[in-house]
């Protein structure tokens, strides 16, 4: 797997590296949602950040706006399985990561 700056794999990592991209994609997995409903579903995201995120996802071809609601495109739907995999990994290893972050570091 090549992870150079201009490789396709790096592009995929960039799509899920943004804090809100995978959250918004996951929140749309059951179908279209209006901006306010999407914001309530997610929680903890400002209206401005949500707007910026859905616009970026639209630009990337992952989300489209139809009749005032945001929905995943077929391309966006292909991200659901990898996002679910990250969620499983976090559930299994999240405590280990937190423990590592809380270790006392040598001076």
Where in the sequence are the language-model features?
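N-terminal helix-turn-helix DNA-binding core of bacterial DNA-binding proteins
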Residues: 2-49, 60-62, 71, 77
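Short, hydrophobic-biased segments on the C-terminal half of alpha helices
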Residues: 54-55
